[in-house]
Regions:
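Short glycine/serine/proline-enriched coil/turn segments at secondary-structure junctions
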Residues: 21, 70, 118-121
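Long hydrophobic alpha-helical segments typical of transmembrane helices together
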Residues: 158-188
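Acidic, metal-coordinating catalytic segment for phosphate/diphosphate chemistry
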Residues: 14-51, 57
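Short beta-strand-to-turn element immediately C-terminal to the catalytic PLP-Schiff-base lysine
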Residues: 55, 130-131, 179
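Conserved Nudix-box catalytic region and its N-terminal flanking loop in Nudix hydrolases
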Residues: 2, 7-9, 41, 51-53, ...
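Unchanged
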Residues: 39, 48-51, 82-169
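Residue-level detector of beta-propeller blades
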Residues: 12-13, 111
Length: 188
């Protein structure tokens, strides 16, 4: 459903690059507001990303533990990574990240949803998939990635979400959507 409230739309009337990094690009735009006034919008331009929640035949999900420097904590997440190019197929990115971070290959990968991660200051979208029919292989992370693979029942992952112990937004969405999907399929 596309929202059509045209009285809310802001029009860009100026733009400048503040920072141009390897991953992120910071912009400062001047916008015309719906009431005719102007405002400044600082935002992060991001190439987008894909994430995948791997589900083993025995009902366990595969998660990854890694240190996240910006929050200074080790997190429990689903495998994910940025699109290598703006036109990269998100499904190919999800497949690559699954293999790199966990070593697994999947027979089936299905789209769960797409989420806008931080709509107040970034244009990043993450495409979230579920992977089944998994075959184990060798993990091959990037040189600057240090990741531990963790397997647990989906029910335990849901419990960790509800306790606030899994708090990464893409992972919360994926775990809860997969649980819902599993319940719906069980009722068919």
């Amino acid at each position: 459903m596309e929202l059509q409230d045209k009285d809310l739309i802001e029009e860009k009337i100026g733009s400048e690059d503040i920072f141009d990094g390897t991953l992120l690009h910071v912009k400062r735009d001047t916008v015309k507001l719906p009431n005719g006034g102007t405002a400044t919008r600082e935002w992060i331009k991001h190439p987008g990303a894909s994430a995948v929640i791997p589900l083993l035949d025995d009902g366990q999900v595969i998660l990854v533990k890694q240190y996240r420097y910006p929050i200074g904590r080790i997190t429990l997440e689903i495998p994910a990574g940025k699109l290598d190019a703006p036109d990269e197929d998100p499904l190919l990115c999800a497949t690559r990240e699954l293999s790199e971070e966990t070593g697994y290959q999947a027979e089936n990968i299905t789209k769960l949803t797409t989420v806008a991660t931080t709509v107040g200051f970034s244009n990043e979208y993450i495409h979230i998939y579920a992977a089944t029919g998994l075959m184990a292989g060798k993990q091959h992370t990037d040189e600057d990635e240090f990741i531990n693979v963790v397997k647990m029942p989906l029910s335990q992952a849901v419990e960790l979400v509800t306790k606030g112990e899994i708090y990464d937004a893409k992972s919360v969405a994926a775990i809860l959507l997969l649980e819902r999907s599993q319940k719906e399929n069980a009722n068919v």
